[in-house]
Amino acid sequence: MIRYTVAGHSRRCVVGASKRVGAIKCITVAATKRFISNKPNEVFTKLTNDNDPKRDAFFKYTWGSWLKNDKQEKEKRFTKFSIEGLNRILNDIYIQSNEMAKAPDGKILPPVFNKNLTVSLVNNVVPKNIGKINPNEKVQVTTLSSIHEGKHHRIYKVDTNLNKAFILRIPYPLENENTLSYRIRSEVATMDFADLKLGIKVPKIFCYGVNSLNPVRQPFVLQEFIEGELLMKDWDPLIEDGSSNQKKYDNVIKQVSDFQSKLVSLKLNAFGSIYFNNDLKDGNEKEFVKEDIYDGETNPDLQNRWKIGPSVERCLWRHKSHLDFHKQMKPFLGPWPKKSPMDIIKNTGLLEAENAKTRIAMKEAGSSAELMYPRTLKEQITTYENLAKIAPDLFNVKTKAIPNMQELLSPRLFHPDLDPMNIIVNKEAQEAYLLDFEGACTKPFILQNSPQFIAYDGPKIYDLKEDITDFDKLSEAEKAQYQFMYKRTRNQHQWEKKLNDNNPKLITAVAPPVKLLRSPYIAAVERKTEEEYLLIDESLLQLKEVWDIFAQNDLVNQKKFPLNYSKEDIERHVEDLQKLHEKLISTPFAATQGWIPQDMFDQLLNSGSIVKQENGDYTVKQPEATK
């Protein structure tokens, strides 16, 4: 019998073992506070009955609620999978482990494509990683714990009767299986590359499936469980200088920077994303670069292990399931030759413009129920076509004005989630592991944006007393605002200082003119809402103001700014951008697209601050105006 727990609010869900074989005990806990639960209620169900509705609570999304379309958003994140199928896969990898024990020491074998439509990384499926099983013994899942419900996937801890734990990652079905397939295939191969070639500590991946036809009945990744604490526990971005926690602050910067240094340490031979070479047998060979992923490999086991294929950077795939993949998406996904780094920007713009055109056509044909205004989509087309048009001229790739330009343009591995929240320090050895590589790609360092945990685009203050006139005479509220700006500036400066220590040839990538030149592309990559195309326009207009200076200094390719903006265009942009800022300020939870952490949501609902409407949506009750 397997028992599992569904916790409320914090949603730490557990499935535990019992002596009654053949049944699952489902435990639903209503928590009053994150990680604090009341006494659970227990329900029993048979292990082999995957369709028992009693266990559905274990798979439901519980970490937050949405003000709009809450029911639909939660249904999109329902991650029901076959526990019995997971059990079979675990037994299969232990059988493979026994076979791997016969392989020569140090031999690195290629991934094995199994008959059940899963793929095993047999190099990792060895006794030292998963333990041993006695002859005729079967592996049995004894406990399932839902330990994290993230933006893109659900994380389950899997305990077995061998006292060995695993992690099962199930992506939310927010996109079609083709998108998930590319993403999983590339992420697994990239983690394998980071482990075997770059020497980065990552969880060992044992098995994965890219669609729902495997025994788990969901796309999944089965990997090593690492017990420890997230590095984020030690990160305080608003720490006072000289605080007793200064060493922790410095260590976080160092640990994340060291990961970045290893990620960019090897120059690659193309732009795109990393896949296993033997993915070629099931795909179109034209998708992959034929030449070696990098030069100079002497280990025969690593030669031809990986290839560069289409980029899985999230911005290229986000909200594009309605496009014809082969005709409308594939031409813009790469891979791109290393001689054409700016094609990444150009194709990003062209793909987004194609996406907006298709959405308009679908809306006009009556085949789309989305509520997006046609004007917004038309403005997006103009913006993204402008981005594509300016792409070849954004950087003069032959300039001598930017030191080490060719180093900055070389393909290097980019991790989009380089963050203390994505790093765990294991309990025993106190070693840091980089966890999630979803969306990783190869692109020039000059186009790689700073990690979000230290990114800051506001006014820079390096010294409160010197930079702020009469700082000591300001009100406490004014001082707090400037102190916030100073600390954000300091964090970014410390990150860039560590970059210079680790990779001095790449430091000019954070020079203000270079940041400004790549800012339209970064705004496109980081866009979260429909209206944020305006931030791309804003970056382009800022470039327009300084283009002549950049041209005089040989930073850009064209002497004249490549885009035309009329006075009316600029006035309309200023008005629309102001409306966007007002919307962000006046609309509760706009920054999270209406999502609210569940404990906060329940408190607001119980207090009457949030009111449920007849259609199932919620509104935030505005405070009454004082007379």
From Swiss-Prot:
Predominant subcellular localization, coarse grouping: mitochondrion
Cell division recorded as keyword: no
Gene Ontology, cellular component aspect: mitochondrion
Disulphide linkage map: none
Keywords tagged on the record: Mitochondrion, Transit peptide
Organism domain of life: Eukaryota
Entry annotated with the keyword Disulfide bond: no
Transit peptide: 1-43
Localisation per UniProt entry: Mitochondrion
Entry-linked PANTHER family: ALTERED INHERITANCE OF MITOCHONDRIA PROTEIN 9, MITOCHONDRIAL
Family statement: Belongs to the AIM9 family.
Protein name per its UniProtKB record: Altered inheritance of mitochondria protein 9, mitochondrial
Protein encoded by which gene: AIM9
